[in-house]
Each structure stands twice: as C-alpha cells, then as structure tokens.
Amino acid sequence: MDRDFLKGAAVLGIAGIIVKILGAVYRLPLSNIIKSEGMGYYQTAYPLYTLLLTISTAGFPIAIAKLVSERRAIGDYKNAFKVFKVALMGLFLGGVITSLFVLVQADNIVNRLGNSNAYYSLIALVPALFFVPIMAAFRGFYQGRQSMTPTALSQIVEQFFRVVVGLFLTYLLLDRGIPMAAGGASFGGSMGALAGLIVISIVYIRGRGTVKEELSLTKISDDYRVNQIIKDLLLISIPITIGASVVPIMDTIDLVIVLKQLQSIGYTEELANGLYGNLKGMASTLINLPQVLSVAIAISLVPAISRANARKNRREMEDIISSGIRITLLIGLPAALGLYALARPIIELLYYKNDMDTIINTAKLLSILSFGVIFLTLVQSLSAILQGLGRPIVPAVNLFVGAVAKVILSYTLTRIPQINIYGAAFSTVTAYGIASILDLISVKKYAKMKLDVMSVFIKPFISAVGMALLAFLSYSFLVARLGSKLSTVVAIVVGVILYAVLLLVTGSISSEDLGLLPKGDKLGKLVDKFKLIK
C-alpha cells in the first residue's frame, strides 16, 4: 500500500507540474494579445471563479476518496459506490446552483466591482462552474480506489484544452474588441473543464465492468443512509475547504479593494483595470513561474517526512527538513534577486507588444513582487513539512494571518495617490512574508529542531546575490552592443552558469538536497561520481 501511495503521489505530482508549466506559458502570449487592458478583465473574473469553485468543490475529492477508501478496505464495495453516487448528485446540484447564480448575477457583480467590461470574462466561465464539480466527484472516486491516473489525465487534458482553446478564441475575437477577446480567453477554461470531464467519464464508462464485479464481491454492507453520507462528507470537506479558501478569498478581497480604491483617488475604470492587469495578469505571472520547481519539492517532502516521523528516525527527519528548506531557498533566492535585477529588461523581452507605460509600470511592480518569490516558495515547502509532521491546519492559519495583513495594507496603501497600485504589490509580499515566518517558527516548534543558519540561509543568499549582481552587470555591459532583448537572454544564461559555480564553491548544495528534485537521485549520483560536490 505504501508503494501504491507513493506511486499515486508521483503521478499526481507530475501532472501538477505539467499543469503549472502549461498555465505559466499560457499567460505570456495571452498578455501580448489582449495586453494589460484585457488581462485586467480576465483577472477580474478568475479570482471570483476560483473562489466559487473552492467553496463548492475544494474538500470533496478528498472527502469522497477517504470514505470510498474506508468502505473498500472492509469489503463494503456497495456503500463505497453509494458514497460516490450521493456525492456526484450533490456536486451536480451544487454546480447547477453556482453556475445559475453567476449567469443571473454576472452583470451586477462586475458593476459592483467597478469593472463592467469584465462581464464577458465572467460569463464565459459559467459552464466551468457546472462541469468542474461533477469532475471533482469522479476524481475523488478514483483517488479512493488508489487509482490516480484518471485524475492526472483529466487535469492535463483540462489545462491543455484551456490553453489551446483560450488562445484560439482570443485571436478569433480580437476584432470584436478587447473585452470580448478576454471573454474568449476565459471560455477556454470552460472548454478545458468539459474536456477533462469527458476524459474521466470515458475512463469510468470503460471501467464499469470492474465496478460491477466489485459490487458482487461485497462482504459486508451496513445501512449507510444518505443523510449520514452527506454528514460525513461535509465533516471532512468543510475544514479542508476553509483552509483552501484562504488564498482565493484573499485574491477576491484584493480585487474588490484595489479596483475601488484606485477609482476613489481619481483613476477611471479603464485606467484602474489596466493597472490591475499589469499587476495580476503580467507581473504576478512571472512570480508564479518558480512554483513549478517548489511544487515538486513540496510533493517530495510530505511522504518523506511522514515516513521518517513514523519510523521515529529523528536524524533522518531533521536532515530532510533542512534539505527541503535549503533547496527551496536555492530556487527562490536566485529567482527573486534575478527578477529584481533584470525587472525592466525581462518585461521588455516577454511583453514586447505592450506600450512603454505598461512596460515601465509592470517592471516596477515586478521589482516589488520579486521578493515575494522567496516567501511564496518557502510557504509551499514549509506547508508540506508541517503536513508531513501531522499539522495540516497550522499553515492555513498562518496564511490567514498573512491574508488579514494584506487586506489592511491593500486598503490603506492603494488609496494613497503616490503609492496606488504598488501598495497592492507590497501587501502581497508582506502577506507571504508573514506566513513564511510563522511557518518557519511552527516547523522549529513541532519538529523540535534548530536549523544551521550558515548552510540553510547564508550560503544560498551569498550565491544568489553574486549571481544577480553579475547578471545585472552583464546586461549593462552588453545592452549598448547587442540590444536589450539579446542582452537579457545572455545575462540570464551568464547568471545561471555563475550561480551553479557559486553553489559548488560555497558548498551550498549536497547530493541529499538533489534527491528532493525530479530525477534528483540520478543527478546526485552524477555529481558524486565527478566529485562536483564536497
């Protein structure tokens, strides 16, 4: 069973990384097509969509999986399937209610937000609000059967169709105006959800014979009433939903505050939307890119720490925790300082179709948000560590504290004319900074350990500073000779090479650290063979 669990975790982990990469790559061409105006409309709809989906579905796949798994474990296949049917009907009704609510209220919602042109972006997501809850029921059912491939496959197909259909419709509708084109991008999410649902439904239909065979093998079956199933599902899913809702709630409140506060200090609806698009649709996209690697680390940490904790192997547990934090900083620090050092050149390289005002504003936002990469990647890994230690609620509480601080700062700072949209960026960095510090304190408390400050923090910091400094100097030297775009690419390559050298020189990384990365075991053996690491 342990092998099945690890295999399942690996399958979902790989799928999660693929989905993250597709999502990150999607935003870059999209931003160049609909620019900051369109990204403002798009990003007005998505936080609301994410929040509604989180509330209606977040905890249910896990709850369904838990109840199905428990019933199957005692041979009660009949009631295991009954759990799935009850959950499917409940999520179907939830999807109908949520999608109808947005369909009827979409115009009122965007007007209250102060961004009326976001109507098409929001209304285009209505089908997804219906399809995704149904898909969540199927995913929970298969996860309860220790079959993670259907979930992983549906996730990848969903994201692939979202990207392809979204970009296609954006191009197709561009002549109809930016609001309509942004709606086309949003509709890609609905088509992706439909594609994912179709795939997992096909898997279910093809496997119905196996399910029927299981039902005939039922050894024991008590009277598991529908109202009790609903109660059990809610008892498991509600706490999970509350924890998962922190970030969507934070983003939604941020959306409301930022747009309204900018308009209160004299910005028109269009200008406020454009600035919001610079923040959420362009600068924040780059901040999320390093998560592709930090998510992979987080996935590795949970089972590794849980296993060491279960064996009561304290030395192994402390080594894994230290390596997890160090390797996270080895990713987060250079990404943060590199984005800060080359903020303007990177924005000019990636968002070249936007006007100069947009590029300048987005570069300033990126220079502020770049420091958030350190805290955001830390929050992911530290949350995984706390989950491995059996404290899953703690990181959610810590993130909630950060979210409260973000709301207060966003409200206060964005209404100051000299600060405006930059206050929202600063509040985001502060929120994740607070959460990461609280998570770090919690890890030290529950793991009852001290971290080696030199190896975990100082050495990675020195290497990252050296990398960022040389990358900046390389760009400054080359820009007059090669132009901005080529100089940016060369500076990044130079920075990466120097960073690798500095890691080896300072002894910032060990072969054990590499084991937490995808294919890290093979990489660790390779560097040991050539004695690249001390």
Predicted regions and their residues:
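Specific pore-lining/lateral-gate transmembrane helices of multi-pass inner-membrane transport
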Residues: 69-88, 275-370
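Membrane-interface junctions at transmembrane-helix termini in multi-pass inner-membrane proteins
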Residues: 132-154, 371-401
